[in-house]
Amino acid sequence: MEASDGSNDVVHPEVRAHINSLVSALGGFSADDDGRYKLGDDALEVLRDMKKWIRFYDEKTNRMDVARCLSEANVVGGDLLQILATWPEAQSDSKFKARVALACYEIMTPLTWPIEKDPERTTVNHYRHMPVLQLAQLGYKRDIINFDGAQILHTAIRVALPSMAVPIGDRTPRDQGIIKLVLYFLRNIAMIAPPPGLKYDGDESQISRSATIDAFSYQDIFLAILTIASNMGEDFRTEDVIIMEIIFHLVKRVDIRKLFLDGEALSKAKGEDLVALIKKEKSMLRAQNKRAPTRHNRFGTMVWVQRADGRMSAISGQDALRDSATRERKMDDSKTFRPPRRSRKAEMEPKDLGSPVSLNERANKQLRGFVEEFLDSGFNPLFQHIRKTIDREAPYLLHQHRAQFFYLTAWFLQAERERIKTAKNQGSSTTQDDVSPFNLVAGVLNQEMFITLSRAMDRAYNDKDWPELTTVMRCFSQILLTVQDMADSGDEENEDIAENILNRLFYEEATHDAIANIARNFKDQGFEYLDACTELIHTYLRILESYSKQNVDMQVRSRKRTRKKKKAAKATGEDGDPVDDTRIDDGDDSANDEASAERTSRERKFDFGRFAMRFVPQGVVDTFVQFTKYYRDLDDSQLKRAHRYFFRVAFKQDMSVMLFRVDIIHLLYNMIKGPEALDKSSSMFKDWEELVKQIIRKCVRKIEDRPALIIEMLFSKINSTAHYLEFGFEKQTISGSANPRPGAELEFKKQDLNLEQQIAIAVGVLLDKNQADHLTWVKNVLSNAEVERRAWETAQDALPSVESQNVEGDIENEAPAASSIPQDSTPTIVRPDHDGRRGAMFKNPHLRLLMRLVGFERLAPSEAETPESAWIIPANLRADQLQEAVGHINAAEFNPPVFDDDKSAEDQLRRKSAGTTSRRKKAAFDDDEENDVDNEDDDGLEEFLFEPGGPTARKSDVRPKKKLTRRKRSPGQELTDEQQDEKARLRREKDLEKQRKIKSAARVHSSDEESDQEADAAFFAREKERMAARNALYSRLARNPGEFAAEKAAGKTTKVPVLLSDESGGEDSVAAAERSKRRKRKSESVAGDEDDRDGGSDGGSEDAGTPARDAPETKPLPKRRKKATAFVVSSDEEDSGDEAPANTRGQSSQRSAAEDAMETDETPLSSSPHKTKTTDVEMANDDDHDEEDTPVKAPTQRRPRAKAGFVLDSSDEE
């Protein structure tokens, strides 16, 4: 061998030298032995060395150099096949020959392994070797299946046969490895096919599907596959997916309809296909010849065309002289559309399916025999085992195995149906009398298979794995068709099984949702996905419609309703509200059980019309429109599928407006009248022609009725727009919220209107809103009630006077005629005529206003009203009053009211004021009625629930508390005492001004000028009692400070009034009291000394003694550090709802007058204050044991707040 140039050689020279030396030492043809192949002395070791080179060099280093060298050395065709030929069947007992054959297959299996481009692992070296190795694999397959010296595939089975004969429990890992090695080799041979991007120079008939099937049949590979498949789960377990792959690559893309045809019928079918292709070609040529050039238009032609806007356009070519349509089309073709550049998407078509396969007569017969035997013996064991493997996600299960499983399931189900159909046409039975043909595929028609199918569909849809979803949809379609054939078979047992299967398939609402979502969300997944999707929708709707007609009481299970009920029950349990007693205590009540069963049945009842509407939205329509665009390439069954869908939308669902879009109308017109129309000889042409004609006719009529449709034809339609365009009114819906709110209550702006004028205004509003049907309904209800009560009044007038005086005694014993007369106290129930009216009675405020004006009343209160709440005509309304109300409505309809300044009737109404509503709600729900009496006339002050300056209704924007650290200041940054005092004074003035404004706005109003002597006397009496109690408390505390601790230990409580701070000046005391109310109830409060510098406590008490019981509990504020603390006491009986804590200071903590000016320190308390030796004093409230009374320390000297070494006093109070 000539030395290769290292710079040009794609393989390292040393690697090539090693491989070539191994090939030379393997053996060769001997001239002394009649040219037969003779093994070398160390052939077995050489074969093992080759395997090591492939495993440890190519696989470990992710290279293909060794495979490239072996292909160039022609090891497979020149050496390995010749070595296998030296092992005849007569020498099967030779262990050396068996080892050598096994070593040969250990080399051929990796050499024939499918080559895939992994973007994460592909290198430049792969791109150098892949095309060469793909062509080399085609040569390997040609040499293996056409080798005359020996049956190479049969020899592979002979190698694995000793391992297969060992029971599964006694097999060693080596036996398992040999079996899998041979099966993978067979899989590789079946899988090798010419790549789409490379041209094979040899004879493709030698490597075609027909040649492969012929080799598998001739060399008994089919028998081995059937043996392993039929014993799957017993003698074989982990080989299931390998057998499935072999079968998949043998039957994929094979036309099942032709598979079960005999020789003569097959030739006839192929002839019909050829005739159809010729007709299609002629049709294409006919359309092309209309625009094709002739010998008369060799010279150039240019035409000026004047457009609608007056501009001129130049068109070249003599075909522009033909007609206006051609000229417009040429102008459109001259326009260039440059869409935005997008990254090239991955191929959406299943890459392992390839193009359709045409088998010769011999291969067709062999494959049909294998399929029939496989269905009879191996289908159920193999596919049940594979389904279990998929469910448990076995480690040897690969991603593509799921898609192959569902594809083969669909393929064999269709094959079984075709076999039954062929046998029925020939009048023969395909199976034994005691075995139903559908029992042969029962392994994929059970509940476990449906669960696996549903799970795979959901996973593929969520993961956007469109190839797998395509196979799942095809499998689902074939299952439905098979079950439908079972239902139509005429066998009672099969019909029962089919009905049970359909019931389980259609019972889950999740399946309905998945089908609808798949149909609606097609984008650009490819034609295979589009074909499978439309086939599934067509089959699902057709079978579901037929089943729902036969089972009018069909039920579905919804997970949404279950989740809603669980959520509602959980919310009820959390809120602590008692559950309805009728659902718990009355479990044995048959009436309640019947009502619950009826409600559940009504909720679960299936309505096919409502379900079919889910396939009307624009997304589903666009899916079928995209499918119909391939009408030139679709067969009759596919064209029928699209035709039935458009017919269902336009005529069965009465939503033809969804098809009224410019591109859809243009497509439908071109299918019939366009330059590339459907072939008129097609069996579907007449159906499509009639459909298109009716759709365009409806479109023209709809444009006349709804001129707005001209604009809407440019856009897709949402549900609300489509409903309005189709029916002329908006869709009436009721809010699906948990607690729907009724319509707003209205009132008249003018209060001096009489009843007739009010009814006239309400009628005018309904007429202005085109809601005259509500008026008609109200009049009918009133008229019926008037007739009923007129008859009752007539009957009452006709009774004798004696009987009328003895109603209680005699009427009960009267004849049935007299007892049938309604009593005076019987109201008339107002019943809506349809659901839309019921929703209007609940939501339409103008209809509700009219109903109240004519005398209708609600049984339920406003707060508990629901859409199902009943309205009545009370019994106290006489027939004349009802007749008068009808007359007012008729008069207003005939002569609607007219108002000044061109105002409408709706302008005379307004919503009821918020103050009125709040007062009504407060009177209904508030228990504290004493505070509402004084504020009844105020304008909204009764809603003032919090103290002035308290927390607001908005979200708190307080920043989180920062950690307090000492900050070292430079000497130049320290503030002097004068500067600190000035800042404190400004801060105090600002706070006092703010509090004065709050107090003035909240407490000072017009009622302050009025005098109430009784209220004043009561107020001063309460203040006198408080002062007396406080003085008594002071005296007791001065005598014995530990007395309260002893009483607390003995279980006693002392009720004392709240201590009020005595500050200088009324305003200062009020501000201090309001600040105290905003603090945390458990926090400590600071009050001034008992003897303030500005005098007595009476003046301060009078201002600060404003009742605080109206203030609600607010959010606890941070604790504040005080200079001094005292004890906390509970409020008196009148103030039991809230505490007003105050503190006092002992004589030991007195300070100078300068320090008293700033006694409250606003620094927050520490979370764990230091303990001090104090006396605990805790006062409790006898009236409310739930109050959180905090034990407060006795007067304790706190650590003063310090900054930069100076002790700072608070400046919040003066």
UniProtKB/Swiss-Prot annotation:
One Pfam family it belongs to: TIMELESS
Biased composition (Acidic residues): 926-945, 1179-1189
Gene Ontology biological process terms, A to Z: DNA repair; DNA replication checkpoint signaling; meiotic cell cycle; replication fork arrest
Protein known as: Topoisomerase 1-associated factor 1
Similarity comment: family membership: Belongs to the timeless family.
Compartment list: Nucleus
Gene coding for it: TOF1
Known partners and oligomeric status: Component of the fork protection complex (FPC) consisting of TOF1 and CSM3.
Entry GO CC: replication fork protection complex
Annotated function: Forms a fork protection complex (FPC) with CSM3 and which is required for chromosome segregation during meiosis and DNA damage repair. FPC coordinates leading and lagging strand synthesis and moves with the replication fork. FPC stabilizes replication forks in a configuration that is recognized by replication checkpoint sensors.
Region spans: Disordered: 316-357, 555-601, 815-841, 894-1017, 1044-1214
